[in-house]
Amino acid sequence: MTTTSAFMLNVRLDNVAVVAIDVPGEKVNTLKAEFATQVRAILKQIRENKALQGVVFISAKADNFIAGADINMIGHCQNAQEAETLARQGQQLMAEIQALPVPVIAAIHGACLGGGLEMALACHRRICTDDVKTVLGLPEVQLGLLPGSGGTQRLPRLVGVSTALDMILTGKQLRARQALKAGLVDDVVPQTILLEAAVELAKKERLAQRTLPVRERILAGPLGRALLFRLVRKKTAQKTQGNYPATERIIDVIETGLAQGSSSGYDAEARAFGELAMTPQSQALRAIFFASTEVKKDPGSDAPPGPLNSVGILGGGLMGGGIAWVTACKGGLPVRIKDINTQGINHALKYSWDLLETKVRRRHIKASERDKQLALISGSTDYRGFSHRDLVIEAVFEDLPLKQQMVAEVEQNCAAHTIFASNTSSLPIGDIAANAARPEQVIGLHFFSPVEKMPLVEVIPHASTSAQTIATTVKLAKKQGKTPIVVSDKAGFYVNRILAPYINEAIRMLTEGERVEHIDAALVKFGFPVGPIQLLDEVGIDTGTKIIPVLEAAYGERFSAPANVVASILNDDRKGRKNGRGFYLYGEKGRKSKKQVDPAIYKLIGVQGQSRLSAQQVAERCVMLMLNEAARCFDEKVIRSARDGDIGAVFGIGFPPFLGGPFRYMDALGPGEMVATLQRLAALYGPRYAPCEQLVRMAERREHFWTNGETDQGN
């Protein structure tokens, strides 16, 4: 059996070798271990051809250079030594590219990430296109790793240590102009002339190393370096709370290379890569990566999707404006907005204008592209322009009769095949569809706020929703750049259902006297991006608590909020950040004054505000209720799999990614430990902590939510 090479060498008449990268049968180029032999064969030919003037590496794919190394390679490593060997092999290959006797140019169009950028860094010069798809970065930290093929050593020497630390510690991706400004690439050109521009660069004599800016040169010296690394360590520890060991190792490895030389740096990089690959944090983060990749490929149902050429939106408020933006500007679909007045339409249009104008100002897109995307959005105060819409999303108030009226109006004014998707966060989809003439075309599509930032959507079919409606709605969500999970039509759906007891318990501890900042800090230390009380302020106390009575009516007392507390807060006109006062006080809009806890909140709820519980106890009380409810959702088939439950929690509410999601975390703790902990908490705090039947059964049978074959890598 003949294997087609992913690297093809062509020597032009002008004696420039062009190496085209095209992984067979894949949409995206990724580096695999078996490619080393192919690359070395090409490098041997290049070294032996004394007439060559230069070499250009370029992708034959339409929209990516190299998107990174194949992460499955790490999953195949049985121990740290094997992972370290993998890194050393990558380092050696990059060193051989760098050692070529003629100028070597990386011609970059599309994603150049991870191992792809490390390969480009091994080239002597880099040139990239000005296309919006072109991004360069080292995102390994997001998988609990560090760049293992020389990236931690070459990048600081090319762009300076502070820029390199920022890129590697955050996984930040630079667009073309940003990369040029940083010194990461030497030129930016239109895609049409990329190859010729790279060839011309390859014909030139090797240029001297780029001179770093004065600031970077100062920071590269012993005194500047010592100060920089001290500050970076402090800032990173505050941000990660010690939950991400990769960040500490990245700092150590870069410092080693600068202080002791490249050889020591490469050695430290390989050892750190091997050790990090075996950490539970990296295994969990890689599992989330594979799970999200699988979800993005999941069509939602076995039926083929229906037509999806244009979309209507009912309501031009915050959610409607955000949905219009992701539909038109991410999905490329024409959008028609209907609102009861022109102010609503103008608000939605301004929402998109502001987001696009920010992109223009940051030079991410051109003004012409902004205008082209805005032209996809139009509006009216009636149903003109709706007759041919394939799908209509309602984003109106949480009022059942109003939403039922919207269904009737859409059925009357739109095509027979038009799907009605409700953005409700709490109302049953079956109730919204109760009077529909075509209930099979009614579905829930729950976005999270702010729509342009939150990656998750819940797709909620009711009992009569057709398979094609599900498939079409999932297809739309993907076009909008979202990660969709299909969940059952039960009160709270999935994300809000597991979030509610978590927030309720935080408020309950507040009534027991725990301080606001202590509760929030405890959950941030556990790994959440913000604490539960701050989250409620950010969402809006009125909005965030509206679902509590719905859940209490459906599931009983375990969802009841502490008596009268929420009412007292709302009656005092405290809505959170949106009106400047909630549990916290906020400075004037536009000012950088920090939020601070409002001392009056304690008097309002009748407590002194003196913390007694440890951070671990606070986190345990909140998180265990969330986990217990997630297990119930699994048992009741609210979610289709543990995979969907983990993705929903991580992408929807910021469950700590380094734990892999609630189900992977419960598997790590073990069902027996889960049950024992919940029983202990139930004895202390009441029956709301009683372990659910699913966990008790699993403890008896020693079962897990994830099977062994699903845990570490893509299937």
From Swiss-Prot:
Q: Where is this site: Important for catalytic activity?
A: 118, 140
Q: Which GO terms describe its cellular component?
A: cytoplasm
InterPro entries named in the record: 3-OHacyl-CoA_DH_CS, 3-OHacyl-CoA_DH_NAD-bd, 3HC_DH_C, 6-PGluconate_DH-like_C_sf, ClpP/crotonase-like_dom_sf, Enoyl-CoA_hydra/iso, FA_oxidation_alpha_subunit, FadJ
Start and end residues of each stretch annotated as Enoyl-CoA hydratase: 1-190
**GO-annotated molecular function:** 3-hydroxybutyryl-CoA epimerase activity; enoyl-CoA hydratase activity; long-chain-3-hydroxyacyl-CoA dehydrogenase activity; NAD+ binding
Q: Does the keyword Oxidoreductase apply?
A: yes
What Pfam family does this protein match (any one)?
3HCDH_N
The pathway to which it is assigned is: Lipid metabolism; fatty acid beta-oxidation
Q: Which SUPFAM superfamilies match?
A: 6-phosphogluconate dehydrogenase C-terminal domain-like, ClpP/crotonase, NAD(P)-binding Rossmann-fold domains
Name its cellular compartments.
Cytoplasm
Chain spans, region 3-hydroxyacyl-CoA dehydrogenase: 306-714
N-terminal signal peptide? none
UniProt KW keywords? Cytoplasm, Fatty acid metabolism, Isomerase, Lipid degradation, Lipid metabolism, Lyase, Multifunctional enzyme, NAD, Oxidoreductase
Q: What is a biological process (GO) this protein takes part in?
A: fatty acid beta-oxidation
NCBIfam families annotated for this entry? FadJ, PRK11154.1
Subunit annotation: Heterotetramer of two alpha chains (FadJ) and two beta chains (FadI).
Tell me, what does this protein do in biology?
Catalyzes the formation of a hydroxyacyl-CoA by addition of water on enoyl-CoA. Also exhibits 3-hydroxyacyl-CoA epimerase and 3-hydroxyacyl-CoA dehydrogenase activities.
| Protein name (record) | Fatty acid oxidation complex subunit alpha
What is the native source organism of this protein? Salmonella typhimurium (strain LT2 / SGSC1412 / ATCC 700720)
